[in-house]
């Protein structure tokens, strides 16, 4: 089994590409979905967030209010680093558990949808392919303002909190250009899916002989360490 990292910037279209890959039968682990799970009430991350950020980040039902928390961390790099130090280990732990489940079920590759893939770099050493969903800056800004009902200043602040898309584009093996129509994006997703399929047989044969010496073996060791830590 091999791993494919899918990333991009806020409002660049990662969710669109992820959904299209799921429709093609690809197993996808979404870090944003996992992130919501690991901060549910009574989890370790939830308790630490409340301890460091206070009761004001909670909604009336006691759950983390993502909008309130977002307003804090996107205006303070220090607070953002603190939140990441709380949530990222728990997110990676849960993702690694899901990867192992897909491996046990016999899947030949898994796509990891990780917004901060290149910022944290904790998972990049285990990836065979990396994919960036790219759109031009003007399109990204417009989409974010419309999607989250933000002012231009608020949207620019959130975009600047991440690594620039142009820089991410230069780090990836594959780029999906998502500035145009949904149909054009889908054609690119189909081409990516075909490339992944084409390399499957080679990797299956190769994995039988060298799995213990490659990233998969390292992944198991890393998983044991992080789960038992």
Curated annotation (Swiss-Prot):
PANTHER family: BIFUNCTIONAL COENZYME A SYNTHASE-RELATED, DEPHOSPHO-COA KINASE-RELATED. The keyword ATP-binding applies. Pfam families: CoaE (PF01121). This is Dephospho-CoA kinase domain-containing protein. One of its GO terms (biological process) is coenzyme A biosynthetic process. Coiled coil: none annotated. Keywords: ATP-binding, Nucleotide-binding.
């Amino acid at each position: 089994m091999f791993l494919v990292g899918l990333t991009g910037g806020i409002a660049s279209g990662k969710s669109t590409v992820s959904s299209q890959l799921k429709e093609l039968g690809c197993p996808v682990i979404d870090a944003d979905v996992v992130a919501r799970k690991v901060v549910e009430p009574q989890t370790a991350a939830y308790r630490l967030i409340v301890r460091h950020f206070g009761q004001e980040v909670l909604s009336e039902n006691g759950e983390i209010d993502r909008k309130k928390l977002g307003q804090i961390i996107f205006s303070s790099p220090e607070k953002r680093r603190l939140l990441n130090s709380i949530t990222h280990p728990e997110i990676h732990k849960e993702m690694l558990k899901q990867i192992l489940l897909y491996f046990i079920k016999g899947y030949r590759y898994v796509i990891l949808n990780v917004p901060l893939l290149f910022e944290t770099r904790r998972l990049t050493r285990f990836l065979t392919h990396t994919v960036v969903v790219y759109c031009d800056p003007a399109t990204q800004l417009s989409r974010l303002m419309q999607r989250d009902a933000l002012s231009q200043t608020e949207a620019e602040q959130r975009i600047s909190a991440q690594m620039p898309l142009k820089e991410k584009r230069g780090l990836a093996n594959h780029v999906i250009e998502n500035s145009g129509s949904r149909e054009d994006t889908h054609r690119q997703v189909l081409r990516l899916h075909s490339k992944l399929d084409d390399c499957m047989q080679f990797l299956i044969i190769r994995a039988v002989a060298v799995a213990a010496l490659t990233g998969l073996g390292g992944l198991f060791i890393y998983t044991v360490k992080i789960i038992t830590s």
